[in-house]
A protein has these predicted regions:
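S-adenosylmethionine
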Residues: 1-189
Length: 189
């Protein structure tokens, strides 16, 4: 969407030019790099110590940008390996997703974004709410609370947060249609 493109452009054009040759306390600091396998250039990686983020003028400016965009729900921070399951699921607006161990919520945020992805790439096209939804569960009360807090950044009427032992969830048989339109059953556990 246009917000995502604006954030990528901001990283490339507003912040990256100033982060390429940064030195802090006599050491070169590596700039952020794009994660090549993530679609649409939307994921970045950087490994910068906290004192560099807070004290280097160049990185402090980036840090303020990242904190603000995280607070308003435009970006999420997570390990690259945690980005894989939602990508591999290839969630569409009509899908029903059950995440049994969802906290702290970064993968859930990624799933919500996928669920709400536009049905058309036309910028002015009407995109209704998705028909699908996500049930995000965590059995630990404190972690479930953290999940609710994270979910508030991405308000979606298509999200249900639960706090139960995942082994108590019922087995579900869900019909799935394949590319030729036939339906078969997969047991979800």
């Amino acid at each position: 969407n246009s917000t995502s493109r604006q954030l990528v452009d901001a990283m490339r054009n507003t912040y990256m030019p100033y982060l390429r040759d940064v030195e802090f306390e006599g050491e070169k600091v590596d700039p952020p790099t794009q994660i090549e396998w993530y679609p649409e250039d939307l994921a970045w990686h950087f490994d910068v110590r906290k004192n560099v983020l807070r004290k280097s003028p160049e990185f402090k400016r980036l840090h303020q940008f990242l904190v603000y965009e995280t607070e308003v729900g435009s970006i999420s921070r997570q390990e690259a390996v945690s980005m894989l399951p939602p990508l591999l699921l290839d969630v569409r607006p009509e899908h029903l997703v059950l995440d049994m161990c969802a906290a702290p919520g970064s993968k859930t945020a990624q799933l919500i974004e996928a669920l709400h992805s536009p049905l058309t790439s036309e910028p002015d096209a009407f995109n209704p709410l998705p028909r699908g939804f996500i049930v995000a569960n965590d059995s630990d009360t404190k972690r479930a609370h953290m999940l609710v807090h994270q979910a508030q950044r991405l308000p979606s009427p298509n999200l249900i947060v639960t706090n139960v032992d995942a082994s108590c969830m019922p087995n579900a048989l869900v019909p799935w249609a394949n590319a030729d339109g036939t339906v078969h059953q997969r047991e979800l556990k």
